[in-house]
């Protein structure tokens, strides 16, 4: 990546204390060797009826080692089934959900918890509004898309599928931060 700055703009950035590594998209010390080899890519989906659920299920179907889930609302049967299928293939699946999922009438939280997937409730916030999956430490699924039937069929939503191990590492660290203060959920 190459950025061009006029001399006054560069001087102003440096004098303001703005970290030059941010402007250039590099972290101090550079990225890990594996991250340097990969080129980030992304796909975008929109709903209603834009293939968001299908994209999530496809990504979960390709998971090999880990799936970390953070969700506000989780009622999608196809996504819940894809998580269980991944766990049955030996993928380590962990789920953190908003506290509303304890009482939601049609939550898939009970299904995945009863299937043996470690499920936690994040009650430390007014709402735990993240909609994120981190797959195999390289792929992030995120956007406004809730993992629900309504999000696929009725709502105006978006989903990004991002291939970027450096960004995935940051999302995984945030997931862990929330998992650490969340309570285990065994289902109803």
Feature names for model-found ranges:
Residues 1-11:
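Bacterial N-terminal signal peptides that target proteins for export
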Residues 56-118:
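Primarily the HKD phosphodiesterase
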Residues 135, 139-188:
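Signature of lipid phosphatidyltransferase scaffolds
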Residues 73-77, 99-103, 125-128, 139-140, ...:
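Solvent-exposed loop/turn segments at secondary-structure junctions
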Residues 43-45, 68-71, 94-97, 120-121, ...:
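Structural recognition of the beta-strand scaffold that forms the well-ordered cores
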Residues 9-21:
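Bacterial N-terminal signal peptides
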Residues 29-49:
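N-terminal low-complexity, Pro/Thr/Ser-rich intrinsically disordered segments
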């Amino acid at each position: 990546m190459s950025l061009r700055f006029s001399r006054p703009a560069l001087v102003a950035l440096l004098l303001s204390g703005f970290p030059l590594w941010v402007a250039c998209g590099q972290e101090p010390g550079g990225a890990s060797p594996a991250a340097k080899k990969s080129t980030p890519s992304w796909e975008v989906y929109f709903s209603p009826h834009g293939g968001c659920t299908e994209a999530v299920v496809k990504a979960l179907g390709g998971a090999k080692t880990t799936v970390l889930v953070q969700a506000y609302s989780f009622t999608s049967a196809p996504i819940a089934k894809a998580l269980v299928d991944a766990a049955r293939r030996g993928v380590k699946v962990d789920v953190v959900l908003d506290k509303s999922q304890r009482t939601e009438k049609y939550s898939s939280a009970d299904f995945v918890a009863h299937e043996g997937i470690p499920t936690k409730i994040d009650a430390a916030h007014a709402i735990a509004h993240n909609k994120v999956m981190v797959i195999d430490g390289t792929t992030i699924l995120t956007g406004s898309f809730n993992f629900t039937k309504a999000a696929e069929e009725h709502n105006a939503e978006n989903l990004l599928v991002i291939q970027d191990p450096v960004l995935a590492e940051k999302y995984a660290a945030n997931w862990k931060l929330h998992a650490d203060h969340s309570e285990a959920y065994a289902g109803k």
